């Protein structure tokens, strides 16, 4: 089964190697046909602590890292973290 990939905005980066990502989605009310905003927060693993509050990130499902963390950050503001880490170290 493929891993799920979601896109959201970082709301907190105060933890070490962890960011909180807020995902907004719109659903239609079944009776009134009005669109309602629903949101959910995910704890995602940020290995190199590069994400900051307000960043747009893509997170990917992974094996459990801790009790709450089963997602890891794949890209930040449109660029992959693997390529960003190699350019920072060079």
Curated annotation (Swiss-Prot):
GO terms for biological process: translation. Disulfide bonds: none annotated. GO terms for molecular function: rRNA binding; structural constituent of ribosome. Transmembrane segments: none annotated. One of its GO terms (cellular component) is cytosolic small ribosomal subunit. Keywords: Ribonucleoprotein, Ribosomal protein, RNA-binding, rRNA-binding. The keyword RNA-binding applies. The keyword rRNA-binding applies. One of the primary rRNA binding proteins, it binds specifically to the 5'-end of 16S ribosomal RNA. Part of the 30S ribosomal subunit. Belongs to the universal ribosomal protein uS17 family. This is Small ribosomal subunit protein uS17.
């Amino acid at each position: 089964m493929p891993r799920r990939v979601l896109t959201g905005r970082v709301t907190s980066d105060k933890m070490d190697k962890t960011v909180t990502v807020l995902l907004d989605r719109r659903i239609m009310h079944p009776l009134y046909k009005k669109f309602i905003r629903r949101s959910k927060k995910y704890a995602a693993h940020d290995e190199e602590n590069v994400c900051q509050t307000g960043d747009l990130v893509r997170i990917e499902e992974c094996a459990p890292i801790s009790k709450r963390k089963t997602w890891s950050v794949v890209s930040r503001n449109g660029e992959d973290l693997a390529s960003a880490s190699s350019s920072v170290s060079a």
